[in-house]
Regions:
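Basic/polar N-terminal segments that are highly enriched at the extreme N-terminus
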Residues: 1-4, 247
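N-terminal beta1-alpha1 ligand-phosphate binding loop
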Residues: 4-35
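Glycine-rich phosphate/pyrophosphate-binding loop and the adjoining helix
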Residues: 33, 164-247
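A generic structural motif
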Residues: 34-40, 161
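N-terminal beta-loop-helix "entrance" segment that forms/cooperates
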Residues: 42-64
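Helix-loop-strand module that forms the ligand-binding subsite of alpha/beta enzymes
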Residues: 62, 66-172, 237
Length: 247
């Protein structure tokens, strides 16, 4: 059985801080629950250059984004992954610009490269069926956490993937927390060390999100293997069938 590949993306441009901490807690839980079954990679936006989409149409001619920066490497990792964990700080009630640039260019370039393979000339996205989980953190209590989570969920749906959350009551649509107006880079780690109630609820949400993401990825893998003959004639499933069912 092939290993499940996990990609943890820290979308904060800051050096070692709160987002890296909560991503680390999630990946630790993934490792505890998955053991040798999972292969984990981590990607940090820190010191990376991610330019915005120019809507130039170049990717429709070559199948690749014409802008050369750190986008290409993250796109490769995203395509390889079975589970993508986005650890996202709240900026102005939503996604930070660097991550939005990646998401815009990912959708455009993948659609350009692969949509025609699915249904002739019609623009149809392949079924990537990656499990996508959002973790988010704001400085203030109600400062855009749910909106940021919904942006990631919408991204998952557009990319023909499966959004997942942890368990209620701590987690309905994704794991979201706040640093209680503290701006230190290690604020969440300190609050967790103090046993702060809302921070411990966030940690619980992160851990159950990791577990449910892993379980759903297993269901996807086993379901594809079980249904491969039925799905083989549908070009939209070609990518995931090649990924999970090839020798």
């Amino acid at each position: 059985m092939k290993k499940l590949k996990v990609l943890g993306i820290c979308a904060s441009p800051r050096s070692k801080g709160n987002m890296e901490y909560i991503l680390g807690r999630c990946l630790e839980a993934m490792r505890r629950n998955g053991g040798d079954e999972v292969e984990i990679k981590r990607y940090l936006f820190r010191a990376k250059k991610m330019n915005p989409c120019l809507d130039c149409g170049g990717c429709y001619l070559s199948g690749e984004c014409v802008i050369r920066d750190d986008f290409q490497r993250l796109k490769e990792l995203w395509l390889e992954a079975d589970i993508v964990i986005y650890a996202v700080p709240v900026y102005h009630l939503g996604l930070p610009g660097q991550l939005k640039c990646f998401i815009d260019r990912l959708g455009q370039s993948i659609c350009a490269a692969h949509s025609g393979e699915c249904n002739g000339k019609e623009e149809t996205m392949p079924k990537y069926l990656k499990v996508i989980a959002p973790l988010t953190l704001g400085v203030h209590q109600v400062s855009g956490q749910e909106q940021t989570i919904m942006q990631i969920i919408n991204h998952a749906l557009i990319m023909q993937c499966l959004p997942v959350s942890g368990d209620a009551w701590q987690c309905y649509t994704g794991a979201g927390g706040w640093t209680q107006n503290r701006e230190e880079k290690d604020a969440i780690e300190k609050l967790a060390g103090e046993g702060d109630f809302s921070t411990m609820a966030l940690i619980k949400a992160i851990e159950t999100t990791a577990l449910r993401a892993l379980q759903l990825a297993r269901v996807v893998r086993e379901g594809l293997i079980a249904c491969r003959e039925e799905l083989a004639g549908d070009a939209q499933y070609r990518f995931v069938l090649d990924k999970h069912c090839s020798d």
